[in-house]
A protein has these predicted regions:
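Loop-centered beta-sheet repeat module
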Residues: 175-195
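Conserved beta-propeller blade signature
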Residues: 23, 56, 89, 131-132, ...
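Repeated scaffold domains used in trafficking and secretory/extracellular systems
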Residues: 6-19, 41-54, 75-87, 91-92, ...
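Loop/turn-rich, solvent-exposed surfaces of beta-rich toroidal or solenoidal domains
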Residues: 243, 269-307
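Surface-exposed loop/turn elements that mediate protein-protein interactions on large endomembrane-trafficking
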Residues: 1-8, 28-43, 61-77, 92-116, ...
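Polyanionic, low-complexity segments and short acidic motifs
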Residues: 346-347, 351
Length: 359
């Protein structure tokens, strides 16, 4: 497998890795490119998300646009936010200026009718008919609610236990909700834990941890460091990737199905890198940013790892040392590498979108 650089597009703000649509700024003007058609905009879109046959376009001002192809179907003037990609609803919110508390709701984008009877001070995750509300820092809990916002159950993050090694006295919180599998709600936490709750009762079903602070806690199944966790729909697995290796967890049983250490499995491939950043699951592969201790002036290298073959497929220094030194341009961990069909997409710190084509 090999990729060659096809093009570079400067001043890109938002882009959709599923089909390559993007927004950009040039000479003080803003543009949105959908299906190869350039649309002039009053402000530049910050986020593009392909959901089914529609493109969701979101602006920093809170404005939202719904497109089919390059045709505008619906526009909402403000106070919107994108929800998780498992839903086609659009999030809405209002800020209480007296308390600086944000209240959330959601609606179908066509009719804008709120689903919840009242907006609530909880972030929302919606999948099918399940509504999950959570507050990491005030209420410090997760709950399932109905359309009337009544709690069907609640789970306090205090019950996850403290980390008495790295962050004593602090309460754990959600980093990512991975999804619902066989009536299990899976999420990863700030303290390096992976938790599954019964979506009907809110009771803990599985708890895994790679945190040394949990080694003596009988309620946790010990695994190697979890790193970044992703749900893989194809085989109902959770893939956890760190700089040391990866682990595959059966999301239906909570069992560790696979475990791999990069230095042992692929020492001359991915194992030769000193640092692995921004792993991004893409089916049976994951992409990453890489760095050696001898590298200078930031990150310039990316790679693709085959989870089944357990080996590095491709790597490239897409921003060479000379360019990084001369321009201070480099890659950033907040912008991972995406695979879409036969193309690769990644943005650098100067908002240039690099597009690669597979040979």
């Amino acid at each position: 497998m090999n990729y060659i650089k096809q093009t570079r597009i400067e001043n890109v703000v938002g882009f959709c890795p599923h089909n390559g649509d993007y927004s950009y700024e040039r000479k003080g003007r803003s543009y949105l490119v959908l299906d190869g058609v350039i649309l002039g905009k009053e402000e530049v879109p910050c986020a593009l998300s392909l959901r089914g046959t529609h493109m969701y376009v979101w602006y920093a001002s809170g404005r939202f646009e719904l497109y089919r192809g390059h045709v505008l179907v619906k526009e909402i003037g403000g106070n919107t936010n994108l929800l998780n990609e498992q839903t086609q609803y659009i999030g809405t919110h209002l800020l209480d200026l007296a308390t600086f508390q944000t209240y959330y709701n959601y609606a179908f984008p066509i009719d804008e009718h709120p689903v919840l009877s009242d907006s609530i001070p909880y972030m929302l995750y919606v999948e099918d008919d399940v509504i999950i509300a959570y507050d990491n820092f005030r209420k410090k809990e997760i709950r399932r609610i109905d359309n009337r916002t009544e709690a069907l159950w609640s789970f306090s993050f205090v019950d996850l236990g403290e980390d008495n090694i790295y962050t004593p006295g602090e309460v754990d919180h959600i980093v990512k909700i991975l999804g619902i599998v066989n009536d299990l709600l899976w999420f990863s936490t700030q303290f390096g834990r992976l938790v599954a709750l019964d979506v009907a009762t809110g009771k803990v079903v599985y708890q895994l941890s790679g945190n040394p602070a949990d080694q003596d806690k009988v309620e946790y199944t010990q695994v190697a460091g979890l790193g970044d966790c992703f749900f893989r729909e194809a085989d109902k697995s959770i893939i956890c990737i760190s700089y040391l290796g990866f682990q595959v967890i059966d999301a239906t049983t909570g069992d560790l199905a696979e475990s791999s250490v990069f230095l042992e499995e692929d020492p001359d491939g991915i194992g030769r890198f000193d640092y692995i950043y921004a792993p991004n699951l893409q089916g049976d592969y994951f992409t990453f940013l890489a760095e050696m201790k001898t590298d200078w002036y930031g990150i310039g290298r990316v790679g693709i790892f085959d989870l089944k073959a357990r080996k590095l497929l491709w790597t490239e220094e897409i921003i060479p040392f000379e360019e990084r030194k001369a321009t201070r341009n480099h890659l950033v961990t907040s912008q991972p590498l995406y695979i879409s069909g036969d193309k690769l997409y990644i943005k650098d710190v100067k908002d240039t979108l690099h597009i690669f084509q597979r040979e």
